[in-house]
Every structure is written in structure tokens, then in C-alpha cells.
């Protein structure tokens, strides 16, 4: 708590250690075609707070009363790319963090997320069979 480190270099091992040891991971990307950080976060039990864009919007299920009730929320998204909206998302995430039951639901849903090739592969097979008449 109350600690900050600034490193002006990239070290992949250190990056994974930091992400795995964090409760929240901020991803304020203006554009993000896909991104892997949120996927790593899910597996580490780290909750992403991200701009709702590209692959981040496709892979993070935003916290809402409905998504938390259905055990689907995996993080916090902000729609407008602005410091104010980022701050609102951070403050909301910190507020939810205080509710340990809700937080555990978000962490668990993220850790259970499946972004393997199994589902898309089955869908491709189904599609190929459909178009080939088989």
C-alpha cells in the first residue's frame, strides 16, 4: 500500500510479476486491437480497469449490477477516453474492492475466462460442415 515504482525500461519477467501481484491493472489504451495484458490479468486474478476499445471491449465484461449478479463481470471499462472517466472507473473499482464478496466474484469470473482455441475451432468446424453440406 502507498508504494510506487517508475521503471523506464521493459522487462517481461518483471512485468508479469507486477501484474500477478496486483489487485488492479490499469489499461488506459486509446486504441487496442487485442492486447494480452487483460488476458494475463484474468489468469493471475488481477482485475483490469480499461478503456472500452477494440479487444479490451471484446474480452472484458464490464462490472454492472446485472453482470455481477450473473457472475459475468471480469473488470471495469470506461467509454470516453478522458482522465475524468478513467478516474471514475478507478474509484468504482476501489469501491467494489471493499465488497470482498463482489470482488471475489469478479476475480473468479476472470480466472474462469476461456480464450483458448477450443471454442473458435469448434465454431469453424461447424461452419465448414454447414457450407460444405456435411
Positions of PLM-derived features:
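Short coil/turn segments at secondary-structure boundaries
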Residues: 7-10, 105-107, 123-124
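C-terminal alpha-helical cap of glycosyltransferases
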Residues: 117-134
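Short glycine/serine/threonine/alanine-rich loop segments
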Residues: 2, 46, 115
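Nucleotide-activated donor-binding/catalytic signature segment of Leloir-type glycosyltransferases, i.e.
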Residues: 1-14
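Catalytic binding pocket for nucleotide-activated donors in carbohydrate/polymer assembly enzymes
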Residues: 12, 17-105, 111-112
Amino acid at each position: 500500500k502507498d508504494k510506487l515504482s517508475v521503471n523506464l525500461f521493459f522487462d517481461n519477467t518483471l512485468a508479469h510479476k507486477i501484474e500477478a501481484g496486483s489487485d488492479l491493472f490499469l489499461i488506459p489504451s486509446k486504441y487496442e486491437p487485442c492486447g494480452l495484458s487483460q488476458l494475463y490479468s484474468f489468469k493471475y486474478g488481477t482485475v483490469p480497469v480499461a478503456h472500452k476499445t477494440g479487444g479490451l471491449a471484446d474480452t472484458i465484461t464490464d462490472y454492472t449490477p446485472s453482470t455481477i449478479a450473473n457472475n459475468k463481470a471480469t473488470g471495469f471499462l470506461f467509454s470516453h477516453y478522458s482522465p475524468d472517466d478513467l478516474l471514475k472507473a478507478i474509484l468504482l473499482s476501489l469501491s467494489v474492492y471493499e465488497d470482498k464478496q463482489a470482488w471475489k466474484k469478479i476475480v473468479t469470473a476472470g480466472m474462469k475466462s476461456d480464450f483458448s482455441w477450443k471454442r473458435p475451432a469448434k465454431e469453424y468446424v461447424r461452419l465448414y460442415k454447414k457450407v460444405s453440406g456435411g
